[in-house]
Amino acid sequence: MEKRIFTVAKIEGEYAYLKENDSSEELFIALALLPFGVDVGSVLEYENFEFTLA
């Protein structure tokens, strides 16, 4: 599986909106599935079904 890069666009309650850097795709995902310390503007790598801070 290829690595994808996302930026946290906004956080509303317990959910985050992630914008993929290489396209206009946007994800709506629960904060519980993201690494501790994620905030608006954080850059995340998604690989092997796991998000990590870049």
Language-model segments: what does each one mean?
Residues E14-L18:
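Short aromatic-glycine-enriched beta-strand elements
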Residues F49-A54:
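Short, Lys/Arg- and Gly-enriched loop/turn segments at beta-strand edges
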Residues M1, D22-S24:
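Glycine-centered tight beta-turn/hairpin loop motif at sheet-sheet or coil-to-beta transitions
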